[in-house]
Structure formats: structure tokens, C-alpha cells
Swiss-Prot record:
<feature type="binding site">
    <location>
        <begin position="220"/>
        <end position="225"/>
    </location>
    <ligand>
        <name>NAD(+)</name>
    </ligand>
</feature>
<feature type="active site">
    <location>
        <position position="278"/>
    </location>
</feature>
<comment type="similarity">
    <text>Belongs to the aldehyde dehydrogenase family. AstD subfamily.</text>
</comment>
<dbReference type="GO" id="GO:0019544">
    <property type="term" value="P:arginine catabolic process to glutamate"/>
</dbReference>
<dbReference type="Pfam" id="PF00171">
    <property type="entry name" value="Aldedh"/>
</dbReference>
<dbReference type="GO" id="GO:0019545">
    <property type="term" value="P:arginine catabolic process to succinate"/>
</dbReference>
<dbReference type="InterPro" id="IPR017649">
    <property type="entry name" value="SuccinylGlu_semiald_DH_AstD"/>
</dbReference>
<comment type="pathway">
    <text>Amino-acid degradation; L-arginine degradation via AST pathway; L-glutamate and succinate from L-arginine: step 4/5.</text>
</comment>
<protein>
    <recommendedName>
        <fullName>N-succinylglutamate 5-semialdehyde dehydrogenase</fullName>
        <ecNumber>1.2.1.71</ecNumber>
    </recommendedName>
</protein>
<dbReference type="GO" id="GO:0043824">
    <property type="term" value="F:succinylglutamate-semialdehyde dehydrogenase activity"/>
</dbReference>
<comment type="function">
    <text>Catalyzes the NAD-dependent reduction of succinylglutamate semialdehyde into succinylglutamate.</text>
</comment>
<keyword id="KW-0520">NAD</keyword>
<dbReference type="InterPro" id="IPR016162">
    <property type="entry name" value="Ald_DH_N"/>
</dbReference>
<dbReference type="InterPro" id="IPR015590">
    <property type="entry name" value="Aldehyde_DH_dom"/>
</dbReference>
<dbReference type="InterPro" id="IPR016163">
    <property type="entry name" value="Ald_DH_C"/>
</dbReference>
<keyword id="KW-0560">Oxidoreductase</keyword>
<dbReference type="InterPro" id="IPR016160">
    <property type="entry name" value="Ald_DH_CS_CYS"/>
</dbReference>
Amino acid sequence: MTQWIAGNWLAGKGEAMNSLNPFSSEEIWQGDAATAEQVEQAVSAAREALTTWRKTDLSERQAVVEKFAELVKEHSEHIAHTIAEETGKPLWETRTEAGAMVGKIAISLRAYHERTGEKQKDIAGTAAVLRHRPLGVMAVFGPYNFPGHLPNGHIVPALLSGNTVVFKPSELTPKVAQETMKLWEQAGLPKGVLNMVQGARPTGEALAGSKGIDGLLFTGSANTGHILHRQYAGQPGKMLALEMGGNNPMVISKSYGELDATVYTIIQSAFISAGQRCTCARRLYLPQGIEGDAILNRLVEATAKIRIGGPFAEPQPFMGPQISERAADGIIAAQANLVSLGGEVLLEAIRGQGAIVSPAIIEVSNVAELPDEEYFGPLLQVVRYQDLPDAVELANDTRYGLSAGLVSTDDSEWQYFIDNIRAGIVNRNRQLTGASGDAPFGGPGASGNLRPSAYYAADYCAYPMASMEGEQTELPAQLSPGIAL
């Protein structure tokens, strides 16, 4: 039973699916995808449940969400184990994701009251009241890299605001999604308030194209996001929020400070989660001369020693595999393409067991036209620059704009950087993948259009209703011209 529709676990009626552990290639889940008809059943169930859920007192909605948070905390080790098993990420890392699921719920509760609650003030004897109302039926598309944490950051705010939801997880992480839905079921969520449809592209297309949804929250690739954007053109009545990827630049100044701390920050930025975070550094800008040489030599040396392995190996690895062998092959192909364009391999990506790919560092300063691509894996491109304005100009040469970073102890350099860089998340002397749940997450250009995560997700799950209210009608001392009573 792979679909959760109207509070019932159902078998899919579409094509067969399975999920493999990307390290061992062992099958860990199997089922059948939802058909277009089943997707419509889920949307209809959500529409029917909306009538009651939107008028359910906030305290009751909040109680269900808080019960879910308790269950996530209680079962955090099981969740972490399932994420590790299905994504291949090391268990130490997936434990942090399970913890983040609980933390994001607390943020969402606070955000509801601060951003979409009810506010009132008096204006010349009239009550000016701001209320918020749910959008309706929301579709949530989840990614595979954080299959528990990221969908949670959309589903929880949507439910708190009184929306009902149809969730379509990544077809690469169906088991994590299924285990998470079981916790929602245990939390006492009424039937139809949250539904899940499993499947690949046909299932996603059916959900995105359903006339019964009022909004769609998407986290995933730029290519898929752009397809959705075109699909929703001419439909201003539907809310579409896209969180996509980035070709993220990291600039290292000559005034970088301590060498090993800088190298560690680069490694954490480029190779955490085997490079499968949308904020990972893809392009590294190093100064020409001995300062840049020292960093590059130490970086290659340290990266070559990174421990890579299965999710449950002891001692724990820093990196696991790519999500699939297809994804792993894509990184090897990207490396070959950069070499064909004139890139020099300083550290070669090599295929290992399952979907393992070792880190690659490629010098691409002599590549005439560097492809503006998000290589979603452990592939770091190195470019040498002359001065900071040169580095920032090169860093901004991308259609994306998700994250960027500067390593520098010089305050004036940091001021120049934040005044001129084009990105939504900009860090100084910290890894690019570090972001606060209280801050907007996203960026301009091909990286997305809104910021519907964590604290700011509340803004995209409810619409504001503004009212001017008086106890009774009033006749002014002076009537408007042209009116006689």
C-alpha cells in the first residue's frame, strides 16, 4: 500500500516502482505509482476535507502538528536510519535532518502567529483588522536530498494556516515519505487533510495539472521548476512557489586568515552530502599568486583523504554515494566535458561501489565558456582571479543566484562583496550550506521565485484579508459633494 488518500492506504494502479540503497544497490522499497485518476481522488479528498479543516480552531490544528512533532522526536532514530538507508547519506548527517524536522515545526508555529495571525489597530475610530485565510488545496513536491526535512517545511505551515495538502515526494525516496505519513496518521490528522501520491513524472504532471489545486510548493531542479512555471503561465489565481538550485560561487580572498580553517570551510561547502545540497559551492575563486597556490595545494591534499563509504559504516564517512547510479554517471560525464573544454583535473572523480563518486577538483580558468550548470554532486571547479572586482564579476556570471560566499578577514572586502554579489544567501567565513531557518531561503534568477521555506513559508500558505470595521454606520458632519440627504 503506497498511496495515502482520504485517510486510507491504497495500492497504486500505475507503473511499478522501487527504491534502492544507493550504496549497496539493495532494494528497500517497492510499490506501484499513482495514476492520474488516483491523483484526482487525492485532490478531491483534500477539497472535501478543506471545508472542515479551514474552520477548525487553530488550537486544534496546532495540537495535531505538535503531536506530530512529538512523534518525530520519539522516532527520530528510525527516521534517521530510513533516510540514511534510502539516500546513502551517513547516519551522523541524517540524524541532524531528523532533528531539523522537529526544529522547523517550532519555527513554523512561531511564524504563523507573527506573520499570518490576526492584527488590529484603531484608525480614527475605525478598527483596521488584518486577518489571513488559507489558500485552499496545496500541492507539495518534495526533493530527494532532504526527503524528510524539506517537505516538512512546506506541509506544516500549510496545515497550520488551514490548507489541505496533496504531497508528491521524490520517486527516489518513497520509503522516507511513507514512514513520515505514518507519523501524521498517528498524530490524528483528519482524513483527507493530508494526502500522499507516490510516482515519477506522470504522477507529478497529473498533480501539477489538476484544476483542483490552489497552490503548489516545489523544491527541486531548475529544469522541472521552469516546466512548472510555463505550465502555470496565465493562471494568476494559483500560487506557485519554486525553490531550485544554484551554480554557487565561493570567493577566497588573499586575506583569508588561517589556512586549514579556510580549507575546511571549502570542503564543507563543496562536498557535504556528497555535493547534493542546492547551496553547495560549485565554483571556487582563488587569487592568483602564492596565496591561491597554498590554498589549492592544501585543498587537493585534504580532499583526497576524505573518508567515503556506506551510511552505516564505522568509523563514519564524511561522504556517501550519489542518490543513484544515473546521478553518479552524470558527475563523471560532467567531469569529462569540462576536460574536453580545456579543464585540468587536479583531483579526479572516480566511480566506486554502487553510486559512490569520489570528489573532483578541476581547474577551469582556461575554459573559454564555462557551462552555467549545477553539477549536483562532488565536483568543484576552480578559477583563478586577479582582484576582488574581477572575482565578483566572474561569480555573478550565472543565471542562478542561490548562494555565494566570501572568505576574508578584511571588512572592506566584505562590504564590497555584499554590495555587488547577486545571491539570496551570502555568507562570510562560513560554509555556503549554512542557513538559518529564521531567514528567507532562496535566490533570484533560475534559483526560484519566492521564499516559501521555514519562517517565511507562512507568507505563501495564506492570503491577507484587510478590513475596516465600525460598530455601526456613521453619518459624517459634512456630506460628500453631490449627495443630499
